[in-house]
A protein has these predicted regions:
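C-terminal substrate-recognition "lid" of short-chain dehydrogenase/reductases
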Residues: 130, 227-262
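Substrate-binding pocket helix/loop in short-chain dehydrogenase/reductase
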Residues: 109-110, 114-122, 219
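Short C-terminal tail/terminal secondary-structure segment
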Residues: 2-14, 158, 239, 250-264
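Conserved glycine-rich cofactor-binding loop
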Residues: 19, 26-28
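Short, small/polar-rich loop/turn modules that mediate ligand/substrate recognition or access, typified
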Residues: 190, 195, 249-251
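Alpha-helical segment proximal to the catalytic Tyr-Lys
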Residues: 138, 183, 187-188, 247
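Active-site helix of classical SDR
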Residues: 133, 174, 182
C-alpha cells in the first residue's frame, strides 16, 4: 500500500476524531497521558483495575469535552483484550492509538528471583501488552493506520534499578523484552500503515513509587537536567507518537529521562 505523507499545512498534533486506548489510566502516567490526548482532541477508552479511579478519570475527560468509556479489568485477564477492543469499537468504530501503560515493578536480584516473581512481572509487562496490542493491531491493520505506544523504561538499557549493588533483574529484563517486542511488531505492521513505538521513561515520581520514593530520589544526582521526572514530561512525546507528526517513525524507543543515559 502507498503510505500517506503528512500535510504540513495542517496542525500535525491535532487528534480530533481519534479514539485512544490507555491502560493503567486511573492514576500517574496513564491519567496524565489520557488527559493530554483529550486536550488535543481524542476520545478515550480508559483501562484499569479500580472503578473509583477510572470513574474519576472519566469525569475529567468529560469535563474536557471528549467522549470516554471505561474498562475495569486486570490487563492480564484472559478476556481483557476482547473487552478493550469491543468497548472502543462500540464507542467510536475505530481505534487510532493504543498506549500500553499498565505495568508492574519489583526488585528481585539474580540469586533471589523465583519463578513466581519472574512469571508475575512478565505477565504484566510483556504478555499483557502483547495480547492487547495483537487485538488492537487487527483493527488498525484493517483501517490502514494507527499508532501503538508501549511504555518501556530506561532501565531496559542499564542494570540496577534502585541501588548500586544490583536488583531489578526481573523488571529490567521485562522492559528490555517489551522494547524488543516493539521493534518486531513494528516491522510486521509497517507495510500496513501502522506504527509501533516505545517510550522509555527514566526516574519518574508517580504513585507507583510511593513506597520507595526516598530511594527514587537518590537518582537525581545521576540526572544531568537536575531534577526528578514527572508524568507531564512524557506527555509531549506521547502526543507526538500518537499524531500525524510522527507518521514516518516506527520501531523506535524514545528515552525521556533528563539525560540520565548520557552518563555512567
Amino acid at each position: 500500500m502507498t503510505l500517506p505523507v503528512p500535510d504540513v499545512s495542517k496542525n500535525l498534533f491535532d487528534l480530533n476524531g481519534f479514539c485512544s486506548i490507555v491502560t493503567g489510566a486511573g492514576k500517574g502516567i496513564g491519567l496524565t497521558l489520557s488527559k493530554t490526548l483529550a486536550y488535543h482532541g481524542s476520545d478515550l477508552v480508559l483501562v484499569g483495575r479500580s472503578t473509583r479511579e477510572l470513574e474519576a478519570a472519566a469525569d475529567t475527560i468529560r469535563a474536557i469535552g471528549r467522549k470516554v468509556r471505561t474498562v475495569v479489568t486486570d490487563v492480564t485477564a484472559e478476556k481483557a483484550p476482547e473487552m478493550i477492543v469491543n468497548t472502543a469499537m462500540d464507542m467510536s468504530r475505530r481505534i487510532d492509538v493504543l498506549i500500553n501503560n499498565a505495568g508492574s515493578m519489583t526488585f528481585a536480584d539474580m540469586l533471589g528471583v523465583d519463578d513466581k516473581i519472574w512469571d508475575d512481572i512478565y505477565s504484566v509487562n510483556v504478555r499483557a501488552p502483547m495480547r492487547i496490542m495483537k487485538a488492537v493491531l487487527k483493527e488498525m491493520v484493517k483501517a490502514g493506520r494507527g499508532s501503538v505506544i508501549n511504555m518501556g523504561s530506561s532501565w531496559s538499557s542499564r542494570a540496577s534499578v534502585f541501588n548500586q549493588d544490583g536488583g531489578g533483574v526481573d523488571y529490567c529484563s521485562s522492559k528490555a523484552a517489551l522494547q524488543a517486542l516493539t521493534r518486531a511488531a513494528a516491522q510486521d505492521v509497517a507495510p500496513k500503515g501502522v506504527r509501533v513505538n516505545n517510550i522509555a521513561p527514566g526516574a519518574v515520581d508517580t504513585p507507583m513509587h510511593a513506597d520507595h520514593r526516598d530511594l527514587l530520589y537518590q537518582f537525581v544526582k545521576y540526572i544531568p537536567m537536575g531534577r526528578m521526572g514527572v508524568a507531564e514530561d512524557l506527555a509531549g512525546t506521547a502526543v507526538f507518537l500518537a499524531s500525524d507528526a510522527s507518521t514516518f517513525i516506527t520501531g523506535q524507543t524514545i528515552h525521556v529521562n533528563g539525560g540520565m543515559l548520557m552518563v555512567d
